[in-house]
A protein has these predicted regions:
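Short, basic-rich loop-to-helix N-cap that marks the start of a DNA-contacting helix
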Residues: 24, 48-64
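Residue-level detection of the helix-turn-helix DNA-binding "recognition helix"
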Residues: 21, 35, 47, 78
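Conserved hydrophobic/aromatic packing and binding residues within compact polymer-binding modules
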Residues: 16, 27-31, 42-45, 73
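Recognition helix of helix-turn-helix/homeodomain-like DNA-binding domains
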Residues: 36-52
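The alpha-helix within a helix-turn-helix
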Residues: 20, 31, 63
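Residues that mark the N-terminal boundary/hinge immediately upstream of a DNA-recognition element
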Residues: 15, 26, 55-58, 69
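A short, Lys/Arg-rich alpha-helix, primarily the initiator
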Residues: 1-23
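Short, charged recognition helix plus adjacent turn
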Residues: 1-6, 64, 72-82
């Protein structure tokens, strides 16, 4: 189960990064959207090596700023189990 959760979180990070890059939004700009001053916060999340991940408030802010639904950033559970 823990392995599936890690994969699920990895997929969320990947979806957010894909949407960020598609919109030419830098890590700094995304960090500022999330209320942080440094791009290091987003870099830590995107590398998934520091046990930091997006929370629901982050996903709401990202979806709002990107003009998409929160559900666009969340993978289907069945996809995460493969």
């Amino acid at each position: 189960l823990e392995e599936n959760i890690d994969k699920f979180l990895d997929e969320i990070v990947l979806k957010v990064k894909e949407e960020r890059v598609k919109r030419n939004i830098s890590q700094l700009m995304l960090a500022q959207i999330l209320g942080h001053k440094s791009p290091n916060y987003v870099a830590k999340i995107e590398t998934r090596k520091h046990d930091v991940s997006y929370n629901l408030s982050h996903l709401y802010k990202i979806a709002y700023e990107f003009g998409i639904e929160v559900t666009d950033l969340i993978p289907h559970i069945q996809d995460s189990q493969k």
